[in-house]
């Protein structure tokens, strides 16, 4: 049963919806608390009853945007899928959702990219949470013999670099038409089939040599 909303909760939700509309329409740079108060039909002083600062409001917008992506991560990690399938779904479901958001409204998507750049300290906690859940999947994979010789932190760093375009909305936005879940599946297969600490000869022992 859903928890009954207080007047404060309802007011915060209504203001958040207005703020999301404003961000999606024209980004966050020109936004002021006075303007939002005017749009909401209240005084600026009253607005501060619901959000104590502009930063608190941006934090609520970030939480609103990330909430469904966090739910995806939680559900995938809690599933009984094998590690390879689990890692694919961990990325694929979030990518599919973000791609649909981009297809629905590229301008709004770009506004969220800019919001993330302007307020990266608000985004960092969600990046860290993603690494936490990825570490859990990597740990399961290592228990089955994958990623031999690597520490969990090393594996996280490498996998983040390999899969970055599928979760980093700034990078994703630039090449979205070239990204697909089919390509992602091949990437995850390559990660599981080859990622380890073993030196297979790619790095020369005596520096670069001319062709």
Predicted regions and their residues:
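Basic, helix-initiating cap at the start of DNA-binding domains
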Residues: 1-26, 30-39, 56-59
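C-terminal peripheral helix-coil segments that are non-catalytic and often amphipathic
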Residues: 2, 89, 132-143, 161-211
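Hydrophobic/aromatic residues within well-ordered alpha-helical segments
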Residues: 11, 54, 61, 65, ...
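Short hydrophobic/aromatic patch on the recognition helix
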Residues: 40-51
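Hydrophobic alpha-helical connector segments
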Residues: 60, 64, 74-100, 156-159, ...
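Amphipathic alpha-helical packing segments from all-alpha helical-bundle domains
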Residues: 67-70, 97, 117-144, 153-158, ...
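Amphipathic alpha-helical segments used for helix-helix packing
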Residues: 86, 98-118, 135, 168-171
């Amino acid at each position: 049963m859903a928890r009954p909303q207080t007047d404060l909760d309802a007011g915060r939700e209504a203001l958040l919806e207005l703020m999301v509309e404003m961000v999606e329409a024209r980004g966050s740079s020109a936004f002021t608390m006075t303007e939002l108060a005017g749009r909401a039909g209240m005084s600026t002083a009253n607005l501060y009853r619901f959000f104590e600062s502009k930063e608190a409001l941006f934090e609520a917008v970030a939480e609103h945007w990330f909430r469904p992506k966090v739910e995806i991560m939680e559900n995938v990690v809690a599933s009984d899928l094998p590690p390879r399938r689990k890692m694919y779904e961990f990325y694929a479901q979030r990518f599919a959702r973000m791609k649909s958001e981009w297809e629905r409204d590229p301008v709004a998507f770009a506004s969220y990219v800019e919001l993330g750049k302007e307020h990266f300290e608000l985004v960092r906690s969600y990046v860290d949470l993603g690494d936490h859940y990825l570490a859990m999947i990597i740990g399961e994979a290592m228990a089955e013999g994958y990623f031999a010789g690597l520490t969990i932190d090393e594996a996280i760093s490498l996998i983040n670099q390999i899969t970055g375009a599928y979760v980093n909305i700034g990078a994703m936005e630039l090449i979205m038409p070239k990204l697909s879940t089919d390509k992602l599946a091949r990437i995850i297969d390559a990660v599981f089939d080859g990622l380890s600490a073993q030196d297979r000869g790619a790095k020369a022992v005596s520096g670069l040599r001319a062709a």
